[in-house]
Structures are given as C-alpha cells and as structure tokens.
C-alpha cells in the first residue's frame, strides 16, 4: 500500500496530467485498474490515514482532527520541554482501535511501514505497538526532506527510537531503501508493506523559503527552469512526485524480479487532495476543503489475474473500503466486535459487481459535506451549495433553489449520519464536546 502526501487529482499522467512525469504510476494504471471516483474521509493528513487503517470514519474512530502544533506554522520555536507536552507529542490514535496490521498478524503476515505515520508519537501510539513489526520513518505530520527535522526538532525514527543516523539522505530515497530491504528479507512469507511517502508535501521548516525545497536539484532540472516563484513551487512539487514515481518503479521491478507480482496486491492513492503546487483539475477546491478537490484523489490498484489490466472503474469507492478489502484478500474476517464503515470492494474492481457505496459524509471542524448518489451538498466557510456530480464534477452550479426536495433529503441523510456518529461508542468527537 503506497500513499502519497497532498498529490492532486491531475498530478499523474494517467489522470490527464500533461507536464508531470509519472511513467511508473502510469505503468501501474496500465497493468491494473484506475479508479476515477475514489474519495478519502478527510481533506487532510491525520484523520485520512486513521480511516484507511481502521476502515472507520474519523468521527467513529476518534481521530477526527490533526495532532499538530499550529504555532509552529507561524514561526514559533518551542523549547524541548514545551514541545514534549504539545498536542502533536501527546495525541494519538485511540489504542482501543483495531488497525489493519493487527488483524493481518492472525495470518502470520510480516508488517512494515516506511514513511509517514502521523497517528501519534508516544510509545503506545507508535507502529510497533499497533501491529507493525518494523518502522523507519517519522510519526508527526511533516518534516524537512533532508534534515528529517520538524521545525528544528529531530523526528526520524527507527522503531521507537529517534535517530539522526540518516540525516542528509533525501526522505524518498531513505524510504525506498528501507522498503526494498523489507521486500528482500520477507519475500518468502506473507507481508504487508505500507509506504506512506511524505512527497510531495511541503517541508516543515522554520525557514519559509525552505518549505518549498521538496526535491533534489537534479530532479528539478528535468523540468523547464521556472521564471516565477509560483512556477518554482510547481516545479519542486512535480520533481518530488517524479522522484517518488521512480521509487515506486523500483518496488514494482523488485516484485517482478522476485516472482511475486502475480501474488501481490499493489494499491496507490493520495491521502487527500492536492495543496500548494498541486493540480486538482477539473475539481473545485484543494487540501483542507470538503469540495471534491479536497477529498477525491487518484487511486490505482493492481492484482494480476484478478483485477483487469488497463481498466477504469467509475464506481464510487472510498478509502474506508481498503481495510475490509485487504482482509478479504488475505482470507481473514474483520473482528466481530467493531463496526466498519467500508466493504470489500474486490468484486467491484474485478468488474463482477456494482459498488454498494451509495452515500459518503465529511466533517472538518465547521465544514460539512454529504454525498448521496451523485448529489453532493456542501456547507463550508469556502462555499455552499447542492451539486449534481454526474454533470457538474467541478461543483460550479448550485442547485439548492432548483432542487429543494433533494437538498432536504441529502441534509437529512447527513443529520442521520451525524446522529450515528454521536452515538458511536466508545469514541467519537461529539462525545468530547
């Protein structure tokens, strides 16, 4: 399972990107199926990642916002004592939640994560306590690509231990190295490899100019020299995606070399819509928004012999489906004592069934959105309206006044969902307020 960070819907050649170079992701699309209508549960990092590992809405699993120090984003430097008790150091995914690798262990899967964890930094929240056997990466929301620091705080970990042994190595190269090692060492047994790259997320650096230092210089030179700051941001963004693409290609090649491609599911998607430097066209909005540009993301799935090659799936699917789908592929059933919000989407990907996903809901603080069929209602600080996604994917034409009965229906479904989340036990944001 490969996850990019803040990559836009149009930031792959196979999704229509004309200038970005992603030959290996395009190859993955040719050898597998491209999903055109795939959404995540939250328009930013942490809750989205929590959902894909639990199969549950953020409002059900309790991770419904970021574990983050907002003051750092305004240039405030915390000393080590203040940082130690800050939100991003003490928050984490509720330990009562059952994560995907914990269930896969029942079938003796070897589980490794190399990259961005983002679900808590205390020992009880870290990957080794949540079902993973190996972890090399960082546990907070973002770091500098070379120093591996978050606002001057060392953040890279090997296992539970903070380390500076690889300082100076570009993050994507580091995560590729560890993922390759993991595959080679575990090729003879069942494995779950999770590679959540931090590319192309902005760097978390106190120097605002270095926030846009996303890619090695040699990768940037593959694109025309930028003539403006805005264009420079775009080139850095594209170059970081291209480097990530090559790392993905190395993993795909290795699966081929080891004779494992036929028996390995490969899933790629972005954790949310693209932010600065991204191309979300033709969608409205971006990272942080509940419009499609914040929640609809590129997704590719390959399983030779099971999932059609070169196909496009237009069925509505979400990241909530990943947990039950991978368990099903491993011959496992979800724990009976937890409520899942997703379903096994393998029959849909195989072309044998229609999606049972008929509705989807989002809430990010005061922003709300609901989708029932192709009807999408948005009520946010960045805009409101009722949209028919079947003919208005860009959410430009508000039909609230023309379709009051539809608006009432969709808002009613959102109210019912919110009531269900409020009653979710033992977690959920509405229990905390």
Residue ranges and their predicted role:
Residues 1-384, 389-419, 424-433:
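Formylglycine-dependent sulfatase
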């Amino acid at each position: 399972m490969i996850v990019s960070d803040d990559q836009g819907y149009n930031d792959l050649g196979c999704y229509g990107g004309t200038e970005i170079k992603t030959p290996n992701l395009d190859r993955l699309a040719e050898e597998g199926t491209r999903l055109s209508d795939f959404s995540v549960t939250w328009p930013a990092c942490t809750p989205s990642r929590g959902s894909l590992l639990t199969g549950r809405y953020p409002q059900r699993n309790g991770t419904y916002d970021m574990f983050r120090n907002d003051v750092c984003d305004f240039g405030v430097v915390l000393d080590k004592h203040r940082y130690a008790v800050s939100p991003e150091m003490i928050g984490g995914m509720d330990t009562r939640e059952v994560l995907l690798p914990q269930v896969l262990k029942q079938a003796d899967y070897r589980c490794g994560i190399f990259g961005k964890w983002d679900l808590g930094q205390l020992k009880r929240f870290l990957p080794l306590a949540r079902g993973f056997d190996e972890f090399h990466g960082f546990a907070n929301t973002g770091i500098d690509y070379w120093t591996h620091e978050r606002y001057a705080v060392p953040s890279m970990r090997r296992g539970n231990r903070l380390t500076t042994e690889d300082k100076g190595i570009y993050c994507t190269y580091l995560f590729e190295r560890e993922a390759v090692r993991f595959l080679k060492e575990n090729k003879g047994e069942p494995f779950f490899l999770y590679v959540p790259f931090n590319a192309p997320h902005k760097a978390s650096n106190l120097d605002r100019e270095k926030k846009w230092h996303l890619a090695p210089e040699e990768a940037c030179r593959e694109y025309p020299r930028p003539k403006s700051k805005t264009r420079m941001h775009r080139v850095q963004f594209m170059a970081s995606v291209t480097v990530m693409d090559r790392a993905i290609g190395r993993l795909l090649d290795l699966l081929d070399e080891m004779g494992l491609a036929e028996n390995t599911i490969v899933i790629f998607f972005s954790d949310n819509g693209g932010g600065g430097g991204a191309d979300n066209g033709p969608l409205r909005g971006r990272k942080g928004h509940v419009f499609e540009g914040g929640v609809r993301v590129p997704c590719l799935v390959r399983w030779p012999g099971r999932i059609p090659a070169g196909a496009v799936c237009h069925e509505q699917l979400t990241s909530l489906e990943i947990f039950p789908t991978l368990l099903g592929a491993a011959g496992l059933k979800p724990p009976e004592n937890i409520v899942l919000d997703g379903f096994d989407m393998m029959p849909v990907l195989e072309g044998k069934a229609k999606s049972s996903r008929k509705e989807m809901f989002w809430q990010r603080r005061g922003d709300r959105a609901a989708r029932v069929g192709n009807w999408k209602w948005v009520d946010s600080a960045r805009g409101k309206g009722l949209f028919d996604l079947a003919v208005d994917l860009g959410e430009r034409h508000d039909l609230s006044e023309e379709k009051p009965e539809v608006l009432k229906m969709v808002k009613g479904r959102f109210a019912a969902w919110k009531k269900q989340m409020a009653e979710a036990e033992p977690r959920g944001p509405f229990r905390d307020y």
